[in-house]
C-alpha cells in the first residue's frame, strides 16, 4: 500500500466571481445560502435553486420559472450547474447500467442497479484508489486524484437526469446511494461529506440517512472524524477473519489492524442513528483463501462484540488476478456456520458482471501508476497517510 496520498482540495469559495464561475453542484445548502447572501439575495433563493437543480435535474437558469429574470441574469454571469458527462453506457442483461463518466481528462464509473422495490446507485469518490486491495480491479489501476463535490454528487445528478427526475416522473429515480465505487471515501472526506449532505438534504435528493451507505476499508482516524461530521449507514470491507490474511489482501490492515478498525466501527455506531446499532460487514469470498469453515468460525468469534449483519460477496474476476471465486457449496457452508452463531448472513447477488460492473470490477480510466509520485507533486502537497 502506498504511504502517501494527495491532499483533498480546499473548500469551494462561495463568493460570486465573473472571472471564474462557481459550479453550484460544488455547494451544500449552507454554502449555497452564503453564495446567495454574497450575491445580495435572500437565503431562500438558495432553496429555490437547489429544488430546481435536484428535484427537476435542471441545469438551465432560464428554466427556473419562479426566479425573477434579473436574478437569473446574475446567476448566468457568475455561476453554472455543470455535472460530469456520460461518455459511455453499458447495459447488463439483468438491467444494471454502467456509465463511464468524464472527470477532466479521465473517467470514473458509476453503476445503476434497479430492483423491484428500489434503485441503487454505486458512486465513485476517487479516480483510482491508493489502498491496493489485491482482489479489486480499481486498486490495480493506482491512485490519481480525489473527486470534487460536483464530480461526486454530479454522478447522482446525471443518473437521475437519465432515469428521470423525481418531479418529472413522479417517483424517485434513485432510492439508495452506496459509496462503493472507485476509491476509498474516507481518504476524500473534504468532498465526500458535502456530497452526502446534498444527497440527504430535502432540497437536494432527500434520501434517508439509512439509504446512503459509505463503505470503507479501514482508515481509522478518518472514520472517527466521520462520526462527528455526518450520520449515514456504514459498511466495512473486512474480507478476512484474522490479521494474517487481511494483511495480505487488504494492505491498510498493516497500519490499522482488525482490532483497531472494529474499535472505530463501534465508536461510530455509538454516535449513529442511521445504522440502528449495527454495521454491515462486507466479506468477499476468495477460493481457498478466506472461505473455509475454519475461517467462518474465526469470523464469528471476531465479530461477537460487534453488532452486525454479514454480506458474503462472490468474488468477481478480472484479468491477471491471482484468485478464484469460491464455489457455491463453499459459500453455502460458510454462511451456515455464521448463521449457527446467530448472525444475519446474506449472500450478495452478483449484478452487472457481464459488463464488468460488479463489486470489485470498476476500473475507469486511470493514468499509468508508474507516474503516481510525479502526478502527486504536480497536483498538490504530498502528505503521509498517517495524517488522515
UniProtKB/Swiss-Prot annotation:
S-adenosyl-L-methionine binds at residues 183-184, 215, 237-239, 316. GO terms for molecular function: 4 iron, 4 sulfur cluster binding; metal ion binding; rRNA (adenine(2503)-C2-)-methyltransferase activity; rRNA binding; tRNA (adenine(37)-C2)-methyltransferase activity; tRNA binding. Pfam families: Radical_SAM, RlmN_N. Disulfide bonds join 122-359. One of its GO terms (cellular component) is cytoplasm. CDD domains: Radical_SAM. It is an enzyme of class 2 (transferase). GO terms for biological process: rRNA base methylation; tRNA methylation. [4Fe-4S] cluster binds at residues 129, 133, 136. The keyword Protein biosynthesis does not apply. Binds 1 [4Fe-4S] cluster. The cluster is coordinated with 3 cysteines and an exchangeable S-adenosyl-L-methionine. Residues 115-354 form the Radical SAM core domain. Belongs to the radical SAM superfamily. RlmN family. PANTHER family: 23S RRNA METHYLTRANSFERASE, RADICAL SAM CORE DOMAIN-CONTAINING PROTEIN. This is Dual-specificity RNA methyltransferase RlmN.
